[in-house]
């Protein structure tokens, strides 16, 4: 219990309630000095064994621990501590430069982080809040004890508001502690200024801060300060956005210095001298490299045709000049080459586009809108790992009373921090959405007003051809702009055109219009989803009937936001889930309104002048060859029945060999048939190791660039921090060198450096109307270009990007995302409404299930974004090697223990790694977190296991639609 000493400082009444586990003698004495000044009692322990014993002896204690000073990993220590005493409160001492290592501990409500350098300011507040947590766990106290506790606590608070977040409490009480003289006499006080998260750091006399931005494809776009001393970057810290809620940085952003100065960075142009993949290279000059590359590119195109050169870009850099959307497109168009059509993470947006339009990227709200939700359903996503700044917003919403529910096959970190976790059978998400929709319709849980005003529910569909009835059906020759949709006026009891403004419209019924039989789109939808009962859904998803019913009613009781990304789209049926989910939102009015809709991917649609950068007077690149059939075309040297020789690959901002499905097709089909392969990168990735020439790219801090953000409403300027290291060059400069050597100097004048390209990109009427100019972005570094903190952007608030401006409940003309000659027989008609189709392979009824009974997943790690950061020392220390994570039941059945070397295998390939028995993994699932490179496996690679089969409509790699088994080596 809390008690109060004569000087007003709180202390614990019972001896031993503070256990001190600090092995370093100097640090231990310093902490003891603080505790003595505060008249705190404590017990010192010498090692982990003694610490565990004292925790057993004194349950409900506060453990003050230097958690990174022990040989065991901090997560192992935490797990053991929780088993010994679930009510234990932790106060962890962490050096400021190691805070990134233990970022996840901040999410633990019973754990407080204290910077060693500020222990004199932060320790007392941390201990006080830890005690407050303990009191919440105590049995009910009698009235007298409660009054005593309240009096004691008020005696300390001295005006500090207790209605604060944990972070705010520590900040505020540290200031008060200094002001009240509690620690003024402490010899450890150094006079350092405490820096609040989100405030601009203070640079030292010899240090300067340069505004930067992380440009990876986690879609977070964290704004950073690069700290520069003596011409070198010393660290990165979060830089404030004007709207504080978007300020933050994760482990990856904090470790960017190590990526910049990586000892394994590609430093010079290199030419292969051994077999591909042998990792034997010779250094060559830039002149030699550019001459050889341009000469071979021109020779190959001259002999085999312009399509024989493939320009391959991925998502490794979202800068508008040097990244995947930048000057590389100008080169591709100038030489009329083949540009691979991306086949990863396309299905979610493809399904959403059928309902709300706008293409495959424009479907999410500004993340701030989640603060206005009543419920947030995190469906098939793990933002704590994948998008930590979005998680901060979800957590803030949760702290304000918003309910957070996670639906996921894996008990993820996000599931752990949610109010409710609903496990689901992998690949059955569409079935769940359809059953929820059926239940809502059956029980009249719909927003009929929204359906009438803002959806196509009242539109009439012809029974003879499945098309929506329009004015042009009876008046041929009307152009699209003058066409209109028929609805049924329920008051006048007749068909009318929508623009005539019917008094009321029928959303259900079958009618006859000029001898044409029609149904409303909602009638078709209602009849269609009746087959998806709760009982059938429960059987296929493993979710109890009453839980599905509860989930449906909770969703309807909005406003509700569904937070999702690309987990579900990694199955062949992925687009059908988003198709169903967006229709479900449209039936219930949970879209286009405050606090409702979808979050996870918010993309700005900005008036960037890409055309001026992309377009030349040359032949445009062919962008219709999907990555999924690339290996077939290269192997056969034909596309369908037509010759289509491909002999060279030029790759930038992509690690194709690591991230394309079924890696073995590179060794079997692609590399043997390619004459020349060039890779531009910063590290020797899988892709670079199998190149003929590699060129060293400048890193993000070594160029000027522009980023239009994902998942926040800002445009950011990347100011060059340092000059390119070694002999690296900016991507745009490399492209220009090749272009000029290929005789395209008119498209790549030497005057066009990156700052000039930025000026071109900003030269648009749209930006002029917004007062966004080059001079302004350079001066301000960050500009909000959509919405405001008071009125954040809501997708579809005023209209949807569809022909009618309404949410479409029926897709009359389903088209494949990209048409590459695939067989669509019998598919188009089925795709007009969402339906459940089991995963092609990862399903219990699959012919392969008896042989390979484990669904293979690739979790997104907090330590990597896809394959980026795969070799960063700080993060490798925390996550040193790939692991095969499996359930206790599956491991026991195979005689496997944590640490055993195992082979994960199927008919396509194998991966040899260490096993980890992990209770977050459900029975029947095996997961290897993604992003590891081939060289980091004992043998094989996780990407050997996946397959290149794609859905003919979404044309998207289905990484999770995969079965494997595992055995001990």
Q: Which residue ranges define each predicted feature?
A:
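C-terminal output helix
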Residues: 100, 118-128
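Long, contiguous, secondary-structure-rich segments that constitute the structural scaffold
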Residues: 731-776, 867-885, 889-969
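Extended redox/cofactor-interaction regions of prokaryotic respiratory oxidoreductases
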Residues: 151-158, 324-395, 400-406, 431, ...
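Conserved phosphotransfer microenvironments
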Residues: 61-81, 95-98
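Two-component/phosphorelay signaling modules centered on CheY-like receiver
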Residues: 24-43
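N-terminal export/assembly segments and adjacent metallocofactor-ligating motifs
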Residues: 146-507, 511, 517-518, 523, ...
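Alpha4 helix (beta4-alpha4-beta5 surface) of REC/receiver domains from two-component response regulators
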Residues: 76, 94-113
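N-terminal leader/propeptide and maturation segments of large enzyme subunits in energy/redox metabolism
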Residues: 272-288, 445-545, 721-812, 878-880, ...
